[in-house]
Amino acid sequence: ILQNLEQETGCHVLLAQKAFSMFSLYPLIGQYISGTTASGIFEARLGKEEMGKENHVFAPAYKEKDMEELVQICDHVIFNSFAQYEKYQHYFLQQECTASAGIRVNPECSTQEGHEIYDPCGPGSRLGVVKSEFPDQLPEGIEGLHFHTLCEQNADDLITTWHAFEEKFGSYLKQVKWLNLGGGHHITRADYQLDELKKLICEIRRKYNVRVYLEPGEAIALNAGYLVTEVMDIVHNGMDILILDASAACHMPDVLEMPYRPPLKDGYLPGEKPHTCRLSSMTCLAGDAVS
């Protein structure tokens, strides 16, 4: 699916390593996509060493000692603010530098109702530069723009975000070479609107003549495995509570942080069957449960 997307649209698909970093599979994954993207120096090294294709990085801020290495091992380095870019601009203006610098923008368009903790466009977000902070002319050396606003979402939300981005930042695309649409695209999900995504990418490339990148993470390995656990005991307190030898906090942190209810094999929603139970863990954290 991802290889076909690249072939039909000319886009570049990158593995977001924060979602799936089983590097033993990188040679296989690399047969179908263009490379990796990282959230810091260690992931950037991993992508360079284990896949060895296009290697991109974004972080809210960079340390000087890391930047010295990143400009050598990464093809794109994306900054979260103009102040951060100006601090390291001298690297990218050197003739021998092959890394391309970009700026992350905040389109100020939220499409994640109920998942505020994962919403980069929420009030007070630290991620990306808002339009009011943008200069009329991009600083010398900036060659691309990046936005990342989605999480496990379909193409319709990307299209909504694109319209907001284009309205605020479309004029800047004439000053750059590439546009990164970030991650959160559930491209390999059965109901994903793949044709709509292809149309959007082709339209962006035709209208603005820029290279287009996408950074799916979970979509690279969606439904590729299971968490297998054992029921150790059943306690009763208003309902049946199963004590498992697994932990939401340790093994499924998104369950507590989003919060998120993972699918259970042969499971149903509460009330759909005669018996309803809660899955909990062997840890001492009272709220370590799947609700």
Predicted regions: what they are:
Residues 2-8:
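A short, N-terminal amphipathic alpha-helix
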Residues 11-178, 192, 200-203:
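Active-site-proximal beta-alpha core segment in soluble small-molecule metabolic enzymes
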Residues 22-24, 151-154, 186-189, 220-223, ...:
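Flexible loop/turn segments at secondary-structure boundaries
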Residues 75, 99-101, 143, 177, ...:
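Structural beta-strand/beta-sheet cores of well-ordered domains, especially the beta-sheet scaffolds
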Residues 105-109, 149-153, 185, 218-220, ...:
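Glycine-rich beta-alpha junction loops
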Residues 154-160, 188-197, 223-233:
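Short glycine/threonine-rich loop-to-helix capping motif typified by GTGT followed
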Residues 178-180, 186, 197-205, 210-220:
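Oxyanion-binding "anion nests"
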Residues 200, 214-291:
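Charged (often Lys/Glu-rich) extended helix/loop segments that serve as interaction or gating elements
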